[in-house]
């Protein structure tokens, strides 16, 4: 039965009024604190991330801050430069304006604030007013409008100085090193140009800190003539005006000679018609807010969180650069290891799902970026991995692909939620061509999982690791390191590994393939993959457990001709099985839309087989929860690969069958009961990454305690799917009230302490922002 929704004139008027209010960026001042004046190139917080929150937009490779007081007013401090794969500050303040009247410096009062899409300063004195608005005009250039109101002539002075000091944590120097001393080839140089100045940078290839081409420049262009004096790493520019004037300045960070050449025409056009570019930016942001803020039931505080999420995701958008030929979205522009254009699939699926609702073009581009490096037949590096999607792509290729990058990673992929994300983009845009474009890529990805990660061939893929120099010898023997006391020895081969495990003469084992398998899950040190601290393991053994309960086993996956394809953990993961269920479900839906009924039928059959297996084999009736299962030498009588790994405790993988819709109602009822139990997951901030009863639980442990917003949202969607929406709404309200910093002006961070609500991890974090936006859409309501 179809239900018609009839909107009365009053309802329509309220919705139109809400939409108009929501789209007004001026209603959302200072949602994120963008003030600051960096004193160091690496001005880190307690966790080694840059501690300020510069404004980035339009995929730009540089960002600006607001002044933090009188000393920095008139400029937009920073500048934050993205040096291919890292964020580094260039200056404490660069191009700071001071105004002089009759030979005296004008004493202004300052009002500075951010709105979505702009930074604004208002400088006020008795006879002079200055209003400065900074927006982004292109993916490489920001535009500053400076409106000066005065009845008298004025002298304008701009100044700036490049940073000298290298590094600090929470404002305290980590050393007395200078930038020039640490990077002698950086060779920063300020030069005057016809209408401004530029900073040129020498070539530095410091793999883990600073990457420049030797061709990069930071350019400043002004719409009025200036006289510039340069003294080493300092400059002063001067101009005279006879009264009220509006002037324009462009700032461009250009990373290659080709970019330097290409952007000059853009800069000339921007200065020729600045109002066009400013209006385009304003209208673009009004459109983001109009599309994105569609929940009239949310409180004003919850709506501000949604705006913070939109600002965060758009700020982490990067335009094409280096090996990444598409726009993309990174985990965190200020994150130590998450900046530049570093792109992960797992983050992408979630980012794109959210951004489809307010920035669908970039949602598509982000997914395209990931699949642009999907392994094709005849690949020169890993021909055995056709369909594989690398874990991390970035500006620079790995040495194996002819680059000098250290971040590019093909050791693993990420869980198969790609089709879920692609389908959400379609649901929002109704773009059938989008499905036609992505469908064959998704099929190849799906087939790779079954070919390269299904050791026992039962259609239930495992997490694992690729064939890679980090995992195996040249001859294909798996590497591992045995540690005992202060001695360690690297060995190779599965037979040797089995003997070492059986003898037990070790304190710990380090297995690169195990690390990669946990990365492949998206949950880096989760208990289910055998990760547990020594103290926790000692306690577990003292309470009657066995150390071997936490020892993982591996299998080689080989093609029919014996070629080593990679490795699988000898356990089938319930979350990956559930994601694969969804993958089949969405592929069937796409195949139907694209007129491929036979393919749709096959994927529906595969989905049903997975659902049957998940409920038969992965649910433990004693503890009433879903778990991974061990792969034994022979299948059990019921067709299962083995028994659930109950001893490693409960984690969010247990509600993955609910989120993906694979659970039976009876099993879902049981799981929800566990989720709502205060002795398990219903903590101060609920639904952490390990239950309180898990032997490996730690409130501050990355994936064995902390609350990640994606797993939280997965849990709520699973509850809703099986009839527990009211309970989900209560948990959402608890999260909103207890997760610290959400409604303040701090950045969105990676995760939260389940017992205290304290924020943890990288700031300005995309997938947290994505899922906070989804929470706003789905669950945030006035209570």
Predicted regions and their residues:
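Extended glycan-interaction surfaces of carbohydrate-active proteins
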Residues: 255, 296-342, 371-408, 460-574, ...
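Bacterial N-terminal signal peptides
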Residues: 9-17
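Long, repeat-rich segments with strong aromatic
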Residues: 569-596, 700-726
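Terminal accessory carbohydrate-recognition/targeting modules of carbohydrate-active enzymes
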Residues: 2, 21-304, 334-342, 346, ...
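Alpha-helical support elements that line or immediately flank enzyme active sites
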Residues: 341-378, 654-664, 712-725
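Aromatic/His-enriched, Gly/Pro-containing loop or helix-boundary segments
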Residues: 129-135, 385-434, 762
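Structural helix-adjacent loops and short alpha-helical linkers that scaffold large soluble proteins
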Residues: 294-303, 355-368, 425-440, 591-609, ...
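Bacterial N-terminal signal peptides that target proteins for export
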Residues: 1-10
